[in-house]
């Protein structure tokens, strides 16, 4: 048995690779699964009977992944330690009839997903990626990771008051990207193009879940490379850290008093109410089946859940140098200051005093600092999968994350050290 190795700046390098390779939730869970496979995990199908042997397993469902590691000799009532995260990010998603256009321009019809900072998507080179559903019932991932689409902003000469009045965007009229020229709109052009990109025959694709992404790669920023700019940090930063932490704990071979779990859900940005969202039954079903596969009873299930703790890891708000007054006067989380503990007395976050103690112990064991985030009383507080997980499954949950700037922008900003500090905290939590 050995302790897991500590993560360092190399973890941040790897995060940038993960972000680039994961333009959609479907790509993100596929990449997480590939990393877990290399750590000895194996996929199990929800339609198969599960055995109770030790080792690492994972379930894939759409844009969600649940992975867990059963230590040798784990009793059926062994509690779980869960790292929760989400795989989706705000963006523009393709409508069922995507081919459109006007005045000699060919365009793609899109719908707004979640709550993006829409100005950040203007005049940006966009790719297109997602999941294609085929005639034979299978699916295929596709990723056009080159400049394909663009939402052009109106020139200031035609919008003279934009600086004084602020940018006003009509969600239907002003956000449809261009992707070529032509006076004739031909139904099926976009999907035919994607069939070619994916190496499929024409007519094979009968359904799709497609979304835009910025093709600009993540990059270190600043004189001393202290910052990282990139897409989808909310919340692939946590998915990546949770995957790395679970793999490290499983590979260490150390004795574990808990069963470590990674739960990365889809659809957090739209309320989590789906079969792959945190408000669905996926996590509870997987944990229950793990108990029963080891010969457990409902009593064992109740005992296991009663002792379970979940860290809901999602990005939070670092103090903004230009808008510091928007923060609570006495809570100013800084980038590279370590992970943040999120607190809200109205249960927008799930953290309570007991949860704070659990997270503080993990950070102390990992020898890293942590910070506390509380919203300004005059500002509405966002929420996470934390309260949903706590209420739906009756398990103690703590909301944490990494402080970033430009949340929900097409390109967000974090500290270069915070990703590996978070990963080390998660290791200490999963292996107390």
Identify the role of each PLM range:
Residues 1-432:
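N-terminal hydrophobic/helix-forming segments and targeting peptides
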């Amino acid at each position: 048995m050995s302790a897991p190795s500590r993560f360092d700046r190399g973890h941040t390098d790897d995060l940038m690779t993960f972000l680039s390779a994961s333009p959609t939730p479907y790509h993100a869970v596929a990449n997480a699964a590939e990393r877990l496979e290399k750590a000895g995990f194996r996929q199990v199908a929800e339609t198969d009977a599960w055995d109770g042997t030790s080792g690492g397993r994972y379930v894939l469902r759409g844009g969600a992944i649940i992975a867990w590691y059963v230590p040798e000799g784990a009793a059926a009532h062994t509690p779980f330690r869960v790292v929760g995260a989400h795989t989706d990010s705000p963006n523009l998603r393709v409508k069922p009839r995507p081919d459109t256009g006007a005045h000699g321009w060919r365009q793609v019809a899109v719908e707004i997903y979640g709550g993006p900072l829409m100005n950040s998507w203007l005049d940006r080179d966009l790719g297109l990626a997602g999941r294609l559903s085929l005639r034979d019932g299978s699916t295929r991932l596709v990723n056009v990771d080159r400049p394909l689409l663009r939402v052009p902003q109106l020139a200031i000469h035609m919008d003279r008051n934009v600086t004084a009045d602020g940018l006003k965007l009509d969600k239907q009229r002003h956000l449809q990207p261009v992707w070529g020229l032509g006076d004739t709109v031909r139904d099926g052009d976009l999907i035919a193009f994607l069939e070619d990109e994916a190496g499929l025959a024409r007519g094979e694709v009968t359904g799709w879940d497609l979304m835009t992404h910025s093709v600009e790669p993540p990059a270190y920023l600043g004189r001393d490379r202290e910052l990282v700019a990139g897409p989808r940090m909310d919340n692939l930063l946590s998915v990546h850290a949770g995957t790395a932490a679970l793999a490290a704990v499983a590979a260490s071979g150390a004795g574990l008093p808990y069963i470590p779990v990674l739960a990365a859900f889809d659809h957090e940005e739209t309320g989590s109410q789906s079969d792959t969202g945190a408000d669905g039954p996926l996590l509870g079903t997987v944990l229950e089946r793990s108990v029963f596969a080891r010969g457990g009873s409902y009593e064992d299930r109740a005992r296991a859940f009663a002792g379970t703790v979940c860290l809901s890891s999602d990005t939070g708000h670092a103090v903004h140098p230009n808008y510091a007054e928007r923060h609570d006067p006495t809570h100013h989380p800084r980038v590279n200051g370590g992970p943040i503990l999120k607190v809200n007395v109205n249960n927008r976050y799930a953290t309570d005093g007991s949860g704070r103690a659990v997270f503080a112990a993990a950070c102390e064991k990992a020898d890293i600092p942590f910070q506390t985030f509380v919203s300004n009383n005059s500002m509405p507080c966002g929420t996470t999968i934390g309260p949903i997980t706590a209420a739906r499954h009756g398990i103690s949950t703590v909301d944490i994350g990494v402080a970033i700037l430009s949340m929900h922008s097409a390109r967000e900003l974090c500290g270069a050290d915070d990703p590996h500090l978070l990963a080390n905290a998660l290791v200490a939590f999963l292996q107390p």
